[in-house]
Each structure stands twice: as structure tokens, then as C-alpha cells.
């Protein structure tokens, strides 16, 4: 009986771990660079490093045989490969996909990209000149931003009025806690 319980909990742990596994092909171990901050000038010139980067899609341009995406870089989770939505951006980078990717499907979405670092590209962010690292993508995963609202629990024993006259005592609106997550 004890062996069955141990087996059950072991299977449960593996099952729960599978829920947070990165998408196939975007595992951290497959890439030599896993953060925008890890990119050095030598990496940009050698064209030999594999990278896994992520962030918010800012702009999409469809070219003749490929699609160009400008991404606002965000740190990526080492476990699930999802970009951290609430952290500050590291910079921007450009991703090239072979073939056509519908630009409307990418608006206001987040992405994790795995591919080859392919040098730099000059561009502008409004009036400022900017040098973008360029990634030729092999694998990618598009994420959708979802929102949850957590309202504080209401303590019924607070005033012993069972909530009937609570509106007299509470003249303000209780703000919910807003949580953002990617799925």
C-alpha cells in the first residue's frame, strides 16, 4: 500500500511539472544565450550563437519571402519560457521568420523565439537611432495576455450586521488586485 501511495505522489509531481514545461524546441538547454543582456558585441559579429529571447511584439512587417517582427525584449522564465510581463524591458530586437505570418494575429501579443543570432540592423525608435540585434527564428511560441481580478474577502463578522448596513460604514470602493499572466 505504501508503494502505491509513493507511486501516486511521484506521478502527481511529474504531472504538475509537465504543466509548466517550456514549449517543445524552446528548452533553455538548447540555447547558448537565454537573455538579451547576455548578448555581447562579439556574439553579434560571429553569427554562431543560438538564442532564446522573448517579449512584446511592437511591429510586424511582411516582406517578399519572410516576416519581420520588432520585439520589445523582456526577461524570459527559465522554466516555462514565458516572458515576464511586469518586468522592465532590456531593449529591442528584430526577428525574421521564413514565410508569411499574419500581422493581425500578432498585435498586442507576446512571443518567445528560439533561433540563430544573425548580426545587427540599424533602425529608428521614433527620432532616435537604434541598433537592433537580429534573430533568424527556428522555433517560436505566441502568448496571449490574460487578466485576473482578485477582490479582498469580505469579513461578515466584522460589524455583526451580516452585511445589511455595510454600505453606511464603507464609503469607498475596495479596489481589486489585478494580476497579469500569459497563456
Curated annotation (Swiss-Prot):
<keyword id="KW-0812">Transmembrane</keyword>
<feature type="transmembrane region" description="Helical">
    <location>
        <begin position="7"/>
        <end position="23"/>
    </location>
</feature>
<protein>
    <recommendedName>
        <fullName>Uncharacterized protein HI_0389</fullName>
    </recommendedName>
</protein>
<keyword id="KW-1133">Transmembrane helix</keyword>
<dbReference type="Pfam" id="PF03843">
    <property type="entry name" value="Slp"/>
</dbReference>
<dbReference type="InterPro" id="IPR004658">
    <property type="entry name" value="OMP_Slp"/>
</dbReference>
<dbReference type="GO" id="GO:0019867">
    <property type="term" value="C:outer membrane"/>
</dbReference>
<keyword id="KW-0472">Membrane</keyword>
